[in-house]
Structures are given as structure tokens and as C-alpha cells.
Amino acid sequence: MEYQYPLDYDWSNEEMVTMVKFYEAIEKAYEKGIIREELMGLYRRFKEIVPSKAEEKKIDKEFQEVSGYSIYRAIQRAKEIEEQKLVKM
């Protein structure tokens, strides 16, 4: 990783750890693939931390600028496939 993840310093340490795990899961979806349930579980936790659609879009844009990976596209792909399948971008 040669870049910094978008983090909000108002988040608790636990929330920051969760967000980093979520960003890593998105990277994994693009680089190797990740089991759908693992990604969706982290996405549900992400939505607890970032419930606002506007904030979600802002974070996705910031993450895509630094990593080249789209949170939105990865989650859309995960929603399209069957359970226990690999999400691979």
C-alpha cells in the first residue's frame, strides 16, 4: 500500500480498524477475489459507521482517487452474485 486510506478522525479506534479492514477487502476484491459474505459483512459494518449516502459517496470518491478501486462497483458486483461465490473485479 503506497497511499493513505480516507479516515475520519472523529471515528473511534475500533471504527478506524473496521474501516481499514473494509478498504483492504475492496482491494482484495480487485486483486485476488474475496468471498461474497466476507465482503458484505464488512460492508454492513461500514454502513453502521457511515450511514449517510452522501458520506459514502465522498469516501468512495476519496478511496478511488488514491487506490484506483471503486467501493460502489465492488459492492454492486457482490450484490449480483450468488452466496459463497468469489467477488472478483
Swiss-Prot record:
Family recorded in the similarity comment: Belongs to the UPF0223 family.
Domain of life where this protein originates: Bacteria
Taxonomic source organism: Bacillus anthracis
Protein name: UPF0223 protein BA_4171/GBAA_4171/BAS3873
